[in-house]
């Protein structure tokens, strides 16, 4: 809140084979996790957190929900709103479907597809491909930070996290605990993809981007490159050292 005017935290659906939860249950689990982070930061007001879509567009889900309603409300009242998406695009796609007029008032920064670098196996893309199609076709201003091989460079280990964070505050201790106990044990390095989206908004000088014509998504979910469609931004480099330096400084600050 000291850097950005955060108006909402919206929960996106997810489903992964490692987690035995339905898509709907994942919304509640993510909501509870967001509330826990608020508690660790001594933030009492959890009204900023909104539950989102309980299924994917690709499964026929087409319902309004608190997250979609809030996205539309915020977009309509502001001249410009940045939406930082670290999951699938279901909530954003439905907001655009229900209120297409917001397209000129929002900009989406998405941890998403890696189609410029070979076969696209990105998790956030595959979760709800129909939502990606809606967002691409809307012509919304869009920046994509591909998971592999770009944001996957944000690799860390429990040794680094404990060296930089452990004992600094409640949140830092919890983040170390979560990293270690999500199967990222002492011998495993793991990328913190999600921090890239926030870092991009903090300092774009840590990134290189290129403008490309928005691709089409084929029926087999591959991409067709184009030349004359609207442009989107695509991140093709990041400075991991600067991003981690800033992250550790902020997490251990007395003002957190």
Where would I find each of the regions flagged by the language model?
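N-terminal acidic, glycine/proline-rich low-complexity segments
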Residues: 1-256
């Amino acid at each position: 809140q000291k850097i950005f005017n955060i108006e909402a935290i919206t929960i996106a659906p997810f489903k992964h084979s490692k987690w035995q939860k339905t898509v709907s249950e994942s919304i509640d689990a993510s909501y509870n996790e967001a509330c826990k982070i608020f508690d660790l930061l001594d933030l009492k007001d959890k009204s900023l957190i909104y539950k989102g879509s309980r299924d994917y567009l690709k499964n026929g889900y087409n319902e309004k929900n608190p997250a979609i309603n809030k996205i539309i409300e915020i977009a309509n009242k502001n001249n410009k709103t940045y939406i930082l998406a670290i999951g699938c695009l279901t909530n954003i796609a439905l907001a655009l479907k229900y209120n297409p007029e917001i397209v000129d008032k929002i900009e989406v920064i998405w941890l998403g597809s890696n189609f410029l670098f070979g076969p696209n196996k990105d998790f956030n893309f595959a979760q709800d491909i129909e939502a990606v199609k809606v967002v691409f076709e809307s012509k919304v201003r869009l920046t994509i930070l591909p998971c592999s091989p770009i944001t996957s460079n944000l690799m860390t280990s429990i040794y680094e996290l404990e060296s930089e964070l452990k004992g600094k505050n409640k949140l830092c201790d919890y983040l170390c605990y979560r990293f270690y106990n999500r199967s990222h044990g002492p011998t495993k390095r793991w990328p913190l993809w999600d921090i890239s989206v926030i870092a991009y908004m903090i300092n774009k000088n840590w990134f290189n981007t290129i403008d490309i014509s928005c691709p089409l998504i084929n029926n087999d979910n591959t991409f067709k490159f184009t030349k004359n469609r609207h442009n989107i931004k695509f991140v093709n480099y990041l400075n991991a050292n600067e991003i981690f330096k800033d992250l550790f400084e902020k997490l251990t600050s007395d003002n957190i």
